[in-house]
Amino acid sequence: MNSLFRFFLIISIALLMVHCASSIPKKSIEDLKTAFNSESTSADKYSKFAEKARVEGFDTIATLFEAVSKSEAIHATNHVKVLEKYGEHAITPQIASFEVKTTAENIQTAFNAETYEMQTQYPVFIRDAENEKAAEAAKSFTWAWDAEKKHLSYFSVATTSLTNGSEKGLSFNWYVCPVCGNTYNAEDLKTSCDFCLTKQENFIGFTEKSE
C-alpha cells in the first residue's frame, strides 16, 4: 500500500512539474527582455535628445523629448516587473548605441523608432503573449503600444513645426501617467488616464522650464 501511495505521489509531482514548465510563457519572456532593452535605450536616447534641443534653442521640443523619455522609462519598468513575476531577476538593461545629431535629425530618428515599435514590435509581442495566455505581459505590451501611437503623432507634429520654422504647433506642457506611461499634451489632458484610470493629479508634469 505504501509503495502504491509513493508511486502515485511521484506521478502527481511529475505531472505538476510538467504543467508548471509548460505554463511558463517562454516567448513572452524573451519579448519582454527585448522590449525592456528597447524602452531603456529610448529613455536614455530621448533624454540626450532633449539636452541637444535645449542647446539649439528648441525648448518646446526639448520638453516633449523629456516627457517621452519618462514614458519610455515607465514602460521599461513595467516590463521588468512582469519579468520578475515570471521568475526572471537581476535584469540589467542593454543600452544600444545611438548618435545625437541635430534636433531635426533626432526627431526623425525618434519618429522612425516609434514607427517600428508601433507597427512591428508591439503587435507581434502582444500576439505572442495572447497565444501563451500571458496576461501580464500582454497588458504591459499594450500599454506601451498605445503610448507609442501617441508619441508617433507628437513627433510628427514636431517635424512639421521644425519644417515650418516654428515650434508654435507644439504644446508647452506635457503629462505622463506614472503607472502605464500614457502621455498627454495640455489640449488632450483627461481627468484620469485612458489606459489605467490613474487620476490626473498623479500625472508627472513637464513644462518648458523643466530642469
Where are these regions (language model features)?
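Bacterial N-terminal signal peptides
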Residues: 8-18
